[in-house]
Amino acid sequence: MITLGVIGVVAALTMPVITENVQKIVLKNQFKKVYSTFSQGVFQAQNQLDMPIACSYWLNGGLCEAVCTEYDPVYNNCKTWQCKDGSPLSADHNGIREDCMVFEEELFNKVFKVVKFCEDNALANGCLTSEYRGTDKVKAEQNPNPEYPYNPNSAFSDTNIKNNYSSWILSDGTVIIKYGKYKDTSKSVPVYTVDINGHKKPNKWGYDIFTFQLKGDKGGIKKIDGLDYASEKGGKTTMQMIQDK
């Protein structure tokens, strides 16, 4: 009886660890698959359009060293920028975006097998569930700042991903959230947040939710890089996952 009791205690202690390790392996393999599929899809869309696509950030960063000239008094994030030498930022400071609309149309309509598209209102229309949290919610929980709250209207905030941004569900369950709205020419940002296992749990940043950024030059899109807006406790950054492939 004592032996059985000891075995039971050991099992109770080790099972959660084993389960957690198994989940990490499963999610790591899923990340590899989705990163590969997403990358191949991007380059396939570019090849099918048969031209160097201008929809990326520069491979080597901005064209000048940018400095902030005005901060938001409420959220303390930068509102306006200029080059360090005082000159204004050029329209292509961060990259070239002229072809983003035609590229995304090719990517999501002719390359990826999309089973559901939400132009906006992703939560109400079923592309996302209530379990998803925006980066502002995650950051406020992990690093609360009573003096300056996190901006609820910036990047992949809760309001943006659930109400304002476009989302797609692919045939394998993968969820893709665009930074901004599909075919919005006023805001062409080649950045995409991807839930690698769809609506399945854990639905956490740094576990199964990661952000990809397209990088390139005047010769077209060259690279799919990681970009990190948030990583929940115990999770990994997108770059860590890419390097751990």
Regions found by a protein language model. Give the residues of each.
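Detector for methionine-enriched segments
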Residues: M1, M15, M51, M101, ...
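Membrane-proximal N-terminal amphipathic helix
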Residues: K24-A54, N60-G61
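Intrinsically disordered, low-complexity regions enriched in Pro/Ser/Thr/Gly and acidic residues
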Residues: E70-K245
